[in-house]
């Protein structure tokens, strides 16, 4: 069992035959929530196990000092100290990056806001024999000079939560990166030296004062052109330093297949540039690359310690949650209190079992309707990939705008992602292989841009999800049906939420459906529509 004590808390259970994981926020419905108790119970129930069946509990935390077994709070559950291991935060990320990846031997790079000690960037050589740390940032340089902490600081300056770096990345495409010319980072050998001298927004203010730059007022949230240019400057500088760092660590390891993890590895724009670097043969980033994957990395480490063999679990899906039965879905549809349904807004609805949900959903999308799509087990990472999704027609900006105005209520500069059959992707996007986790942002091909404007960002890119029918047969069938109806085998895909964690249970999905303005909801084989 793996547990993350920090923000984005959660639990994971790994056995020789299965992996189950979930974030605490999906269960208590509080974004970025710490905690692990509900997540642990969820994992045990999904596996049909008791806590006494667990051989080892591995814990990581966020902070300068690692937790001790006594500080974990596990003793009150009857877990003795000799069944508890404490794992370094960055090593947990490294286990997630390598063990879930496709490469037998890999260079592993972890770039996060912070971990234990003063880590901000670390790199490893990973193979079947183990994961060996080869280097990292200068321990004498505080975390304020790290890539992740710098990105967090600018994100806070712009007025968002430090964990909302994706907003800064999206805003960056609207700005001019050359508006500010001083370098934000230097790389010496394999060490990064950032120019900020403090963390958080105050570090940006001090840097601006020292350089004479005007990044606009704190909290501009994209409404001030100086802040927009600041986002563009930051993103450009981060792309440059990451590319330099990847090439530097490859020169040390001698291995050109790269696995990356840590919150910075969710920067899909930078990832797309890294995969094109000379000397990079392959790039893998696990979908729960941020601290959402900490518990899973801990559990993988624990299995390694128990068996003596490094677990290799190459993934093709981010579905680490459990599926829900028809009986559980019907409890919610019947408003049974046992379903956990909390109706934020009462909206009468009708429901029935649909014989072909993929074809029915595709027909609705083709007619311009916005739908919720709830299937199988939930995704662990921050992106909905066809299990907990809201879907729309990408052929016009009208669906995109309606989605923002009526349901998502988010910043207009943030793009929506396209889902496309893997076999069709190269006809629409500048890709040369699968991109199943929305962790690359390639260019949309010129001939395709006018056909799918709802998913094209202002810079002509898109955060692509390729769909493999062998991995996600139902979602693939939906996209293929939509393509047959419209001639465009691309569907707009975004996470099923509205300023809340992604929905986990049928009751969560139904409550969000009632509270918002979705036209229809597909819960497994059931179609739900408002009266």
Residue ranges with predicted function:
Residues 40-55, 246-254:
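Phosphate/pyrophosphate-binding loops at sites that engage ATP/ADP/AMP, CoA/4′-phosphopantetheine
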Residues 4-31, 72-86, 91-94, 98-198, ...:
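Flexible beta->alpha loop and helix N-cap segments adjacent to enzyme active/binding sites
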Residues 26-50, 242:
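N-terminal phosphate-binding loop and adjacent alpha-helix
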Residues 233-258:
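Phosphate/ATP-binding catalytic cores across multiple sugar-kinase/actin-like superfamilies
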Residues 175, 181-236:
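Active-site cores of enzymes that catalyze phosphoryl transfer or operate on phosphate-rich substrates
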Residues 237, 265-267:
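A general "terminal functional-core" signal
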Residues 40-46, 55-63, 478, 486:
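Short HxH-centered metal-ligating active-site micro-motif
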Residues 50-64, 254-263, 372:
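Short glycine-rich phosphate-binding loop at a beta-alpha junction
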């Amino acid at each position: 069992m793996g547990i993350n004590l920090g923000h984005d808390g959660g639990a994971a259970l790994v056995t020789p035959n299965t992996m189950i994981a979930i974030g605490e926020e999906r269960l208590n419905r509080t974004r970025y929530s710490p905690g692990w108790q509900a997540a642990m119970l969820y994992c045990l129930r999904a596996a049909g196990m008791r806590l006494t069946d667990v051989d080892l509990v591995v814990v990581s935390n966020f902070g300068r000092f690692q937790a001790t077994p006594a500080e974990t709070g596990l003793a009150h559950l009857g877990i003795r100290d000799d069944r508890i291991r404490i794992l370094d935060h960055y090593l947990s990320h490294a286990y997630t990056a390598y063990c879930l990846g496709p490469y037998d031997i890999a260079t592993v790079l972890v770039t996060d806001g912070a971990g234990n000690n003063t880590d901000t960037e670390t790199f490893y050589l990973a193979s079947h024999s183990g994961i060996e740390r080869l280097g990292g940032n200068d321990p004498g340089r505080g975390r304020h000079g790290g890539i992740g902490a710098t990105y967090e600081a600018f994100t806070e300056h712009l007025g968002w939560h430090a964990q909302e770096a994706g907003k800064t990345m999206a805003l960056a495409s609207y700005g001019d990166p050359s508006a500010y010319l001083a370098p934000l980072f230097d790389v010496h050998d394999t060490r990064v030296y950032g120019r900020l001298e403090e963390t958080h927004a105050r570090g940006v203010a001090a840097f601006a004062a020292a350089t004479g730059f005007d990044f606009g007022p704190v909290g501009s949230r994209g409404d001030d052109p100086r802040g927009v240019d600041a986002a563009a400057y930051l993103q450009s500088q981060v792309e440059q330093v990451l590319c330099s760092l990847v090439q530097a660590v490859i020169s040390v390891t001698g291995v050109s297949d790269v696995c990356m993890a840590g919150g910075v590895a969710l920067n899909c724009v930078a990832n797309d540039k890294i995969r094109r670097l000379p000397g990079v043969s392959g790039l893998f980033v696990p979908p729960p690359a941020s601290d959402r994957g900490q518990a899973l990395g801990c559990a993988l480490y624990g299995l390694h310690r128990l068996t003596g063999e490094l677990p290799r679990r190459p993934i093709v899906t981010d579905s680490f949650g459990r599926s829900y039965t028809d009986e559980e879905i019907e409890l919610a549809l019947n408003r049974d209190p046992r379903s956990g349904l909390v109706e934020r807004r009462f909206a009468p609805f009708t429901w029935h079992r649909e014989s072909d949900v993929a074809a029915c959903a595709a027909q609705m999308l083709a007619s311009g309707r916005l739908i919720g799509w709830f299937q199988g087990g939930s995704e662990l990472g921050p992106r909905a990939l066809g299990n907990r999704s809201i879907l729309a027609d990408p052929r016009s900006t009208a669906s995109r705008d309606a989605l923002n105005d009526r349901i998502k209520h988010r910043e207009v500069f943030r793009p929506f992602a396209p889902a496309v059959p893997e076999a069709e992707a190269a006809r629409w996007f500048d890709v040369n292989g699968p991109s199943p986790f929305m962790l690359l942002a390639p260019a949309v091909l010129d001939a395709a841009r006018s056909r799918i404007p709802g998913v094209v960002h202002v810079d002509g890119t898109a955060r692509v999800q390729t769909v493999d029918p062998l991995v996600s047969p139902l979602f693939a069938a939906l996209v293929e049906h939509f393509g047959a109806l419209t001639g465009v085998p691309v569907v707009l895909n975004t996470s099923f939420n509205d300023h809340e964690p992604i929905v986990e249970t049928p009751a969560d999905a139904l409550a969000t459906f009632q509270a918002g303005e979705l036209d229809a909801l597909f819960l497994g084989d059931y179609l739900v529509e408002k009266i």
